[in-house]
């Protein structure tokens, strides 16, 4: 399954819950999705709090999936082709230099 198919699947899920409806309690606005994305990303940090290794890979995978799904939905509602944006960003990153020494 590719990014577009995953996005379509996510949109079907959101539609089935009524979250695209006008009076929903979970409006799929860029603001709300950005907040949700950030909150889910923060949950990933919990897996590394006070340790360097993953102790529950299945739980981490679930949190990563949450982040990915919110990212797909945010790109969808803002009309951004996420696959294209990611490929463009990879090309930009190939030309960048990073200082690998810690300061």
For every predicted segment, state its role:
Residues 1-64, 68-103:
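Flexible "arm" and connector segments at domain edges
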């Amino acid at each position: 399954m590719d990014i577009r198919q995953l996005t379509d699947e996510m949109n079907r899920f959101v539609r089935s819950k009524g979250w695209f409806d006008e009076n929903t309690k979970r409006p799929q606005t860029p603001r709300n999705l950005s907040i949700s994305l950030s909150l889910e990303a923060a949950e990933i940090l919990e897996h590394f709090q006070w340790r360097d290794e993953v102790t529950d890979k299945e739980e981490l995978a679930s949190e990563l999936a949450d982040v990915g799904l919110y990212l797909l939905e945010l790109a969808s509602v803002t009309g951004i082709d996420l696959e294209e944006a990611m490929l463009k960003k990879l090309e930009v990153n190939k030309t960048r230099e990073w200082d690998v020494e810690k300061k």
